[in-house]
């Protein structure tokens, strides 16, 4: 198995959740006497996902948990011994048994940070053999989490701040751990809640859900509730037979809607009554099992008005098929006339929830001005990221023994930036984001108000910039295996992500054909790149 339960109960990465060549390289390092050489790797992506201009950094908490628990068990070492050549020196396996991350240091963007191509999400330094073994698990933990968070952020930007977004993609996710990761990081990216109960238990994600069509169709209308009596919400007064009250209200509702009392489906009405008896303070009707206009809507109104007499207020309706936008408008119109007809003002503002394979295009339609939709449930489109299934993060060596290392290639996009680095975000006087700058770690940081010459990546010429504010991007989270500061909670990271997105200019937030955000190199870093490139590098 590739996963075990961590203290939170979540499926956690284990050391052998890796590619075999990490183990073969580890043997090579050990055999060459280089296992303890101090090395630094950077984890980053080369292009923003989904054709956009930004990404959100995520997965740090999972990485820290993995590093702190990193240890090869006897069974792990025995398996590696079976996978490596039979004449491998047994001393190598004893070395593996003693490995941990006590010598590892991690700097990273806080979760929820805006991230741009080439800027490290993580910097990982420590003994060469160990930090090499960390490559695949860290990529696995960061790439999907960041992709999901970014996808969720895009959907939130489309929906706007007022629509309630529910993630309901567990049944469509790529396996149990993929489902849990998607629920966790869609919440970080801006969704309000998830249908995933385990995400609520383990990660503190707010959970939401009501009923499915199977609940409605399981009732025929001949069922007699074992106890149809319901007490008033205030707790005082006589109990009322809710089923009988609903039948009385149905006549009035059908008269208002111009329907015969036989038209609404009896089984659907029985299902609504059963659900209302179980959840009188949280009754929601699923309207489209049979006919929204002739059945679901009148049955819902009859139950909602019967509950109203007892002091309860229905919390909403849901649609799962058809033209969601048009149906929502029609339903809102009925709610308004019914509110006036029956003297129940709150009825006109009952929340309308929709779901049904909603993607970015349909979401934009549902979020347009004049839409009567209040709550939107999204499954497949958030958890599977159909527009781009992978962020394409990489983990590249940048220094060994304090000496810079650089990968040269005929593809300029795949060249790496050498040396241990610092990253800064430069801002204008109004707080607007100007650019991110990468520089060598030994360089003094940029100063607010001082002119700085930088080399934008991909440009042939340098430019000067005078920032009004300078923000360091990479924070020290783990030093020599020890946590340096408490990690923010998921809710705190979610709030930080929304703050980060609001700082982006509209041109950079634009989801189609956005203006690209600039990442630049300091003069000293650019000179190092040029020097290593000219001499063939390593």
From Swiss-Prot:
GO cellular component, one term: cytosol
Residues given in the record as nicotinate binding sites: 21, 210, 318
Keywords, ordered alphabetically: Cytoplasm, Ligase, Magnesium, Manganese, Metal-binding, Phosphoprotein, Pyridine nucleotide biosynthesis, Transferase
Post-translational modification comment from the UniProt entry: Transiently phosphorylated on a His residue during the reaction cycle. Phosphorylation strongly increases the affinity for substrates and increases the rate of nicotinate D-ribonucleotide production. Dephosphorylation regenerates the low-affinity form of the enzyme, leading to product release.
Family per similarity comment: Belongs to the NAPRTase family.
InterPro entries recorded: Aldolase_TIM (IPR013785), NAPRTase_C (IPR041619), NAPRTase_N (IPR040727), Nic_PRibTrfase-Fam (IPR007229), Nic_PRibTrfase_pncB (IPR006405), Nicotinate_pribotase-like_C (IPR036068)
Protein name: Nicotinate phosphoribosyltransferase
Subunit structure and binding partners: Homodimer.
Biochemical pathway: Cofactor biosynthesis; NAD(+) biosynthesis; nicotinate D-ribonucleotide from nicotinate: step 1/1
Keyword Repressor set for record: no
GO MF, any single term: transferase activity
Cofactor binding description: Activity is highest with Mn(2+).
GO biological process: NAD biosynthetic process via the salvage pathway
Keyword Manganese found: yes
Compartment(s) of residence: Cytoplasm, Cytosol
CDD domains recorded: NAPRTase_A (cd01570)
PTM annotation (Phosphohistidine): residues: 213
Recorded superkingdom: Eukaryota
Chain's role: Catalyzes the first step in the biosynthesis of NAD from nicotinic acid, the ATP-dependent synthesis of beta-nicotinate D-ribonucleotide from nicotinate and 5-phospho-D-ribose 1-phosphate. Helps prevent cellular oxidative stress via its role in NAD biosynthesis.
Organism of provenance: Bos taurus
Catalytic activity: nicotinate + 5-phospho-alpha-D-ribose 1-diphosphate + ATP + H2O = nicotinate beta-D-ribonucleotide + ADP + phosphate + diphosphate
Enzyme Commission number(s) from the entry: 6.3.4.21
Binding of 5-phospho-alpha-D-ribose 1-diphosphate, residues: 380
Cofactors that this protein relies on: Mg(2+); Mn(2+)
């Amino acid at each position: 198995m590739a996963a075990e339960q961590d203290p939170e109960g979540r499926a956690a990465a284990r050391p052998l959740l890796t590619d075999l060549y990490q183990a073969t390289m580890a043997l090579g390092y050990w055999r060459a006497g280089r296992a303890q050489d101090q090395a630094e790797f950077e984890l980053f992506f080369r292009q923003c996902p989904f054709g956009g201009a930004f990404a959100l950094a995520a997965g740090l908490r999972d990485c820290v948990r993995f590093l702190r628990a990193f240890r090869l068990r006897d069974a792990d070492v025995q398996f590696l011994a079976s996978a490596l050549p039979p004449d491998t020196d047994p001393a190598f396996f004893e070395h593996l048994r003693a490995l941990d991350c006590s010598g590892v240091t991690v700097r990273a963007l806080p979760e929820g940070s805006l991230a741009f191509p080439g800027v490290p999400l993580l910097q990982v330094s420590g003994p060469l053999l160990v930090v090499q073994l960390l490559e695949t698990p860290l990529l696995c933990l960061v790439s999907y989490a960041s992709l999901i968070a970014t996808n969720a952020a895009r959907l939130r930007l489309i929906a706007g701040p007022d629509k309630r977004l529910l993630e309901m993609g567990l049944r469509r996710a790529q396996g149990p751990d993929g489902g849990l990761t998607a629920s966790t990081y869609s919440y970080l990216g801006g969704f309000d809640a998830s249908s995933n109960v385990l995400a609520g238990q383990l990660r503190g994600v707010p959970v939401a859900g009501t009923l499915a069509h199977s609940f409605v169709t399981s009732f025929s209308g001949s069922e007699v509730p074992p106890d149809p009596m319901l007490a008033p919400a205030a707790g005082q007064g006589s109990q009322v037979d809710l089923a009988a009250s609903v039948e009385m209200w149905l006549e009035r509702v059908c008269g208002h809607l111009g329907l015969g009392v036989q038209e609404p489906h009896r089984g659907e009405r029985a299902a609504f009554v059963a659900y209302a008896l179980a959840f009188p303070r949280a009754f929601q009707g699923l309207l489209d099992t049979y006919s929204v206009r002739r059945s679901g809507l009148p049955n819902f109104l009859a139950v909602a008005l019967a509950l109203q007499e007892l002091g309860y207020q229905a919390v909403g309706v849901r649609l799962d098929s058809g033209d969601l936008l048009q149906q929502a408008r029609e339903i809102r119109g009925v709610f308004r006339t019914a509110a006036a007809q029956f003297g129940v003002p709150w009825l006109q503002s009952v929340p309308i929830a929709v779901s049904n394979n909603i993607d970015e295009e349909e979401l934009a339609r549902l979020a347009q001005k004049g839409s009567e939709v209040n709550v939107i449930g999204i499954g497949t489109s958030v958890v599977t990221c159909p527009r781009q299934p992978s962020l394409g993060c990489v983990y590249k060596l940048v220094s060994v023994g304090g000496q810079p290392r650089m990968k040269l290639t005929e593809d300029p996009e795949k060249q790496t930036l050498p040396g241990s680095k610092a990253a800064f975000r430069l801002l204008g006087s109004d707080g607007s984001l100007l650019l991110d700058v990468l520089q060598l770690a030994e360089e003094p940081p940029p100063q607010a108000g001082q002119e700085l010459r930088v080399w934008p990546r991909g440009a042939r010429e340098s430019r000067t910039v005078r920032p009004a504010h300078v923000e360091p991007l990479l924070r020290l989270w783990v030093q020599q295996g020890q946590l340096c500061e408490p990690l923010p909670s998921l809710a705190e990271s979610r709030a930080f992500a929304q703050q980060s997105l609001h700082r982006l200019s509209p041109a950079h937030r634009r989801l189609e054909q956005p203006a690209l955000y600039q990442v630049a190199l300091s003069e000293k870093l650019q000179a190092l790149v040029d020097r290593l490139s000219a001499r063939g590098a390593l």
